[in-house]
Amino acid sequence: MESPHEHQQNLLLSRIITNVEKLNEAIMVMNKTLQEINIQNMNIELVAQMFKNYQSNVLFHLEATDNLKDPA
């Protein structure tokens, strides 16, 4: 015959296993979302670097052609 403590422990263990499975699913969803965010951040970083390089090239060109004027 099974002891009441063993039965109670089995119920608790079952609840723990269920909760850990739910937690794992939530973490997997969060990791997928973070991966998508990181991909978008890489795209934003690339565009920002392109604009920075463009600004540097424009400044170089304006200085080289003596067309750089002080801001009004």
UniProtKB/Swiss-Prot annotation:
GO biological process: attachment of spindle microtubules to kinetochore; cell division
Record keywords, A-Z: Cell cycle, Cell division, Centromere, Chromosome, Cytoplasm, Cytoskeleton, Kinetochore, Microtubule, Mitosis, Nucleus
One GO cellular component, as annotated: mitotic spindle
Chief subcellular location: nucleus
Pfam families: DASH_Dad4
Keyword Nucleus set for record: yes
Subcellular location, record wording: Nucleus; Cytoplasm, Cytoskeleton, Spindle; Chromosome, Centromere, Kinetochore
Family indicated by similarity: Belongs to the DASH complex DAD4 family.
Oligomer status and interactors: Component of the DASH complex consisting of ASK1, DAD1, DAD2, DAD3, DAD4, DAM1, DUO1, HSK3, SPC19 and SPC34, with a stoichiometry of one copy of each subunit per complex. Multiple DASH complexes oligomerize to form a ring that encircles spindle microtubules and organizes the rod-like NDC80 complexes of the outer kinetochore. DASH complex oligomerization strengthens microtubule attachments. On cytoplasmic microtubules, DASH complexes appear to form patches instead of rings.
Main function: Component of the DASH complex that connects microtubules with kinetochores and couples microtubule depolymerisation to chromosome movement; it is involved in retrieving kinetochores to the spindle poles before their re-orientation on the spindle in early mitosis and allows microtubule depolymerization to pull chromosomes apart and resist detachment during anaphase.
Name the UniProt record assigns to this protein: DASH complex subunit DAD4
Organism: Chaetomium thermophilum (strain DSM 1495 / CBS 144.50 / IMI 039719)
Lineage: Eukaryota, Fungi, Dikarya, Ascomycota, Pezizomycotina
Gene giving rise to this polypeptide: DAD4
